[in-house]
Amino acid sequence: MHKTPLEISLKANPDQKIPWRCAVCGFVFTGEKPPKGCPVCHSPSYEFIPEKDRQQLTYNGEKFDIMLINGSSHRAGNTGYMADLAEAVLRERGVSYRRFNLSEYVIDYCWCCYAVRAESCAYPCRNKKDDMPAFHAMLAASKAVIIVSPINWNGMSARLKVFLDRTTCMENLFHINKPGLTEGKVAGILVQGHEDGAIKTAMDIWLNFQQLGYVLAPFGIAFRTHGSHFNSVTDREFFQNDELIVRHTRGVVNNVIETMQLDIGEKLKGKLVPVTE
């Protein structure tokens, strides 16, 4: 598994007292190690990351294959576990990728410039103060994206919804007669949750990428739920001992890679007719 900022810091400075921030609610604790749990939101210790002065996310322009995005508010929870499974396949297949846990980044709400006039919503996005400009650039540079999402009230997390809202400036390129940056790219969607809403969540996510011109990999959606009759505290053990979530996650990632390697984007360049909302 990849090393988290928490693990890297602990290895480098095992006895140093530093501030630890809960990536879920923002509570800050100072100590050699993070607390056993967050007293505010009750998240476990693995949701804490070393607190440091915020630096805006940047992108160096280096091309890579796949963006892997954990859209949960819990960076190391059940959605994080599903993302870990996906990341393992990416490493095994030797494709270049970048993983992002959205809870570790600052993404502002969409300003809805399009509501003023279509031309006001343009790329690059007018909001250049948060981390989204780098994400925009990486969506344009990568060949595929794999979204991993929890189910919150029969839908995606609010954090992921804000991220997808902020891609409006890329979708709107088609409406203001400018070349698109995402058509023909490949998407895969992974969803997990305590109970109902998996298919709806996946379809809501897919609609966004469909409007950006992405191609869904064959068998490109997988989901796994536990059940409303169980206490959610048992979900973690269930998922980590479940063979189906492993098999289906690995399958989707494999299918994304195989579809990406067909180079569909290049073959379709200049041949597509944008039809978007």
Mark where each language-model region is:
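Short metal-coordination and nucleic-acid-contact micro-motifs, chiefly zinc-binding Cys/His arrays
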Residues: 16-18, 34, 103-106, 183
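The −1 position to Zn-ligating cysteines in a subset of zinc-ribbon hairpins
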Residues: 21, 37, 109
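Short Cys/His-rich zinc-binding micro-motifs
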Residues: 21-31
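Cysteine-rich micro-motifs
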Residues: 33-45
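Short, glycine-/small-residue-rich phosphate/pyrophosphate-handling segment
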Residues: 176-222
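Short helix/strand-capping connector loops at secondary-structure junctions
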Residues: 226-239
